């Protein structure tokens, strides 16, 4: 599929930028050669990973949300209603001005996000307290005219996989509880991807336009920068007032609703591939790997018996729900190992004449490279147990690496040094001026106040020296 040299090798992951670009092409995740800046094409293999990843989040949301689909085009008169919201997006909007050669009476925006597409319909759908809570989500493409350097899966002009949920509630507190639930859902989602994330409440100048507050989750990339991989916004009754979303309460009074919205994009796949991958290619958790097991016949004699054994193992694993393939191509074993290691297949099974003589197979883990002989009679149980071990091992390794790169800092100089390697945990008095001054002095940004950390100490803001019990994450970001 990809136009590449035979057995092309990746740059070392120590040079993360080159490794990342090479990985996308050689492992056949995305082709960057589409002739529109910031728009990229999924290879079928990459799209299979995407499908498996988004199946997880669909499954989590479907427990108490309903999936829907709203139009891509938003009339200008609806889009321009919420002034603060629009101010945050006006420089990024693509506009449709003509239908064919005929100018449109009303300009149409390509959705940068869907609040202004969805909420006019919510006004029609929400009538009574019995209609609440309303929890819908969709997975769609969105368009933003990014003027910064674009990068596949990370910073795009066409986001191809934007999961956005929009909920309506009777009270502010109920909406706040939904924001907390959204963050719990994201933490569980990323746990399934074996990715530890850091939730934090964004500072006021970095909240979603039109929201009361924003909580986001960030992951740490190999180069020490953080990637925002999920957001949840408490919208208060701001959008309800703009779009006239009211319900009749138990006393018969018309009351403005309170709302939330929360989203995840294909950045989740960027952090999945980047966190676990190595110099040989991808390392995928079993749940999202398109191929979970590859069987390599080692044929130098007794080919029929070896292939029969491989097919028997394949059938047994498939009956257990495992995604498995046999590579019986005429390539040498080393070339096969290279191919499937690049694709991140969690387990490789090798079966040759010697293995058959011992009624065994060789099992190799992609994440650690460990190999061991296991009985053919228990191959299914061995594979399924390894899946659990691999998942746990990947999460523990990623969590350990994250924790090692979070640094307690008390001075501006400390922060300057540590953000080159990871995330600084820094005292902050809460004043916007100090926060912005800190950003400027250290060449990094405040992510937010950790929401999963209880502070029991007293600190001094490194900018103004005021005492505070609050600390914030500071990091370089994408």
From Swiss-Prot:
It comes from the Archaea. Consists of three domains: the N-terminal catalytic domain, the anticodon-binding domain and the C-terminal extension. GO terms for molecular function: ATP binding; proline-tRNA ligase activity. Its EC number is 6.1.1.15. Catalyzes the attachment of proline to tRNA(Pro) in a two-step reaction: proline is first activated by ATP to form Pro-AMP and then transferred to the acceptor end of tRNA(Pro). The lineage of its organism: Archaea, Methanobacteriati, Methanobacteriota, Stenosarchaea group, Methanomicrobia. Keywords: Aminoacyl-tRNA synthetase, ATP-binding, Cytoplasm, Ligase, Nucleotide-binding, Protein biosynthesis. It is found in: Cytoplasm. HAMAP family: Pro_tRNA_synth_type3 (MF_01571). Homodimer. Its main location: cytoplasm. SUPFAM superfamilies: C-terminal domain of ProRS, Class II aaRS ABD-related, Class II aaRS and biotin synthetases. NCBIfam families: proS_fam_I. Belongs to the class-II aminoacyl-tRNA synthetase family. ProS type 3 subfamily. This is Proline--tRNA ligase. It is an enzyme of class 6 (ligase). GO terms for cellular component: aminoacyl-tRNA synthetase multienzyme complex; cytoplasm. It catalyses: tRNA(Pro) + L-proline + ATP = L-prolyl-tRNA(Pro) + AMP + diphosphate. One of its GO terms (biological process) is prolyl-tRNA aminoacylation.
């Amino acid at each position: 599929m990809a136009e590449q040299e035979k057995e092309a090798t990746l740059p070392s992951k120590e040079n993360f930028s080159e490794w990342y670009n090479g990985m996308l092409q050689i492992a056949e995740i995305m082709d960057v050669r589409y002739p529109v800046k910031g728009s990229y094409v999924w290879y079928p293999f990459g799209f299979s990973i995407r499908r498996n990843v988004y199946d997880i989040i669909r499954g989590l949301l479907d427990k108490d949300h309903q999936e829907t689909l709203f139009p891509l085009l938003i009339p200008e008169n609806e889009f321009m209603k919420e002034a603060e919201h629009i101010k945050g997006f006006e420089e990024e909007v693509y506009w449709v001005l003509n239908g064919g050669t005929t100018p449109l009476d009303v300009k149409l925006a390509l959705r940068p996000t869907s609040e202004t597409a969805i909420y006019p319909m919510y006004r029609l759908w929400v009538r009574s307290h019995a209609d609440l809570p309303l929890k819908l989500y969709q997975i769609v493409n969105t368009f933003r005219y990014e003027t910064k350097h674009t990068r596949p899966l990370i910073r795009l002009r066409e986001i191809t996989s934007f999961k956005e949920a929009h909920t309506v509630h009777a009270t502010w507190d109920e909406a706040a509880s939904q924001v907390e639930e959204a963050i719990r859902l994201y933490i569980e989602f990323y746990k399934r991807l074996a990715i530890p994330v850091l939730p934090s409440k964004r500072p006021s100048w970095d909240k979603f336009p039109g929201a009361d507050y924003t909580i986001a989750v960030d992951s740490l990339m190999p180069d020490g920068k953080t990637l925002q991989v999920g957001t949840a916004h408490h919208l208060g009754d701001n959008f309800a007032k703009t779009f006239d979303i009211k319900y009749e309460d138990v006393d018969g009074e018309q009351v403005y609703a309170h709302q939330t919205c929360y989203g995840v994009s294909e950045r989740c796949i960027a952090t999945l591939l980047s966190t676990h991958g190595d110099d040989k290619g991808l390392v995928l958790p079993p749940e999202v790997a398109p191929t979970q097991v590859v069987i390599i016949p080692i044929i130098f004699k007794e080919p029929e018996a070896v292939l029969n054994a491989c097919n028997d193992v394949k059938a047994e694993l498939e009956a257990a729900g495992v995604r498995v393939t046999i590579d019986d191509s005429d390539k040498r074993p080393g070339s096969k190992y290279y191919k499937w290691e690049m694709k991140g297949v969690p387990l490789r099974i090798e079966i040759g004449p010697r293995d058959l003589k011992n009624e065994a197979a060789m099992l190799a883990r992609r994440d650690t490279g460990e190999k061991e002989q296991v009985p053919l009679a228990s191959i299914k149980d061995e594979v399924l147990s390894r899946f659990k071990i691999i998942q746990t091992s990947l999460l523990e390794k990623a969590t350990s690496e994250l924790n090692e790169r979070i640094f307690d800092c008390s001075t501006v100089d400390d922060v300057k040094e540590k953000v080159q390697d990871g995330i600084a945990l820094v005292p902050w008095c809460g004043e916007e001026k100090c926060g912005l001054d800190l950003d400027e002095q250290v060449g990094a940004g405040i992510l937010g106040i950790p929401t999963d950390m209880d502070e029991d100490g007293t600190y001094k803001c490194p900018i103004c020296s005021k005492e505070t019990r609050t600390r914030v994450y500071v990091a370089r970001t994408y």
